């Protein structure tokens, strides 16, 4: 079904590269856009979509590739306008995150407990991110997090994709974390 399409947009930083190769083998006329061109991530591919700045770069890559493929000036102008609309929205989101982070830092409430290191991009917005990511979690960090929940310094955990680990479930149960 996808091999009959005219255009395939994919993230070249994930396993979609294999899918893309298979599609090209079935459809030599398939136009390809790798949205991740020039981008990288540290903690997980999802941070590309969660961070307003990275999201904007993904959109810019799509816009630039589309403009290479398009012949109609009207459609090129439409693509440019839609990109500008999105850029404005994402710039506002970026500014809002910066404002929230700055205010939280001034109040001393900028610590965020998260389930996954993918949220570490929030450190760019003055948040102190404490992660329960199983791949990097140490016993000392876990004990510190538990102690802060016990003292009611923390009360919430941001959880990615409903990935409730045993540690997260235990903290929720023991300290009534949200």
Enumerate the language-model features and the residues they cover.
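Extracytoplasmic metal-acquisition and chelation regions
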Residues: 1-178
């Amino acid at each position: 079904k996808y091999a009959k399409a005219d255009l395939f947009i994919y993230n070249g930083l994930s396993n979609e590269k294999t899918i893309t190769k298979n599609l090209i083998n079935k459809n030599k006329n398939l136009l390809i856009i790798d949205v991740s061109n020039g981008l990288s991530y540290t903690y997980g591919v999802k941070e590309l979509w969660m961070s307003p700045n990275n999201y904007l770069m993904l959109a810019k890559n799509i816009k630039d590739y589309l403009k290479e493929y398009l012949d109609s000036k009207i459609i090129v102008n439409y693509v440019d306008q839609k990109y500008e609309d999105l850029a404005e929205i994402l710039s506002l989101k970026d500014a809002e995150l910066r404002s929230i982070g700055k205010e939280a830092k001034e109040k001393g409430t900028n610590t965020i407990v998260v389930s996954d290191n993918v949220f570490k991009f929030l450190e760019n917005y003055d948040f102190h991110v404490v992660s329960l990511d199983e791949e990097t979690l140490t016993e000392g960090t876990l004990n510190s997090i538990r102690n802060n929940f016990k003292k009611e310094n923390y009360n919430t955990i941001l959880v990615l994709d409903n990935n409730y680990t045993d540690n997260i479930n235990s903290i929720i149960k023991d300290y009534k974390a949200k």
